[in-house]
């Protein structure tokens, strides 16, 4: 890897992790995935996590999970649970040990209670978007659709919701 740029190395590692996680998931060898790191490790881990289905347990402990960073590039249209590390990763200390223990407890609980989303079913599905001033109308329209036998999935139009709806 010494002959390639840092961004190429990060992309290569992300592709390798995507392949590995996908294979482990398909062969039912993992019940969840947890990652930790700064910006580069966050990019590598979450690129692979985003390839796993909605509902599959995913936790990322990251130095960039809070603050002013725009987080769409990390989470995308996925359901990755992000936990701010608060301190940088420079060994285990009184702060990092508590944060990491909490993250491990979270992924273990998620894996134990894992329920993947079943997209097959007897009723038809309608998707809608909601945001602020449209809420009352969407709630009313949703009830009318439910009364006619539809399941209504309402997505917030910004953030992961809107992007997920567009990707369906």
What are these regions (language model features)?
Residues 27-41, 132:
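Short acidic, glycine-rich surface-loop motifs adjacent to enzyme active sites
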Residues 121-163, 167:
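Glycine-rich phosphate/diphosphate-binding loop of Rossmann-like nucleotide-binding domains
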Residues 1-27:
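Phosphate/nucleotide-donor binding subsite
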Residues 39-47, 68-69, 134-139, 162-163:
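Short glycine/serine/threonine-rich phosphate/pyrophosphate-binding segments
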Residues 2-5, 69-133:
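Cap/lid and interdomain-hinge subdomains that line or gate substrate/regulatory clefts
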Residues 12, 16-20, 102-106, 164:
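Well-ordered alpha-helical segments embedded in enzymatic catalytic cores
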Residues 32-35, 44-74, 82-84, 151-157:
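Short, acidic/small-residue loops that bind anionic groups at enzyme active sites
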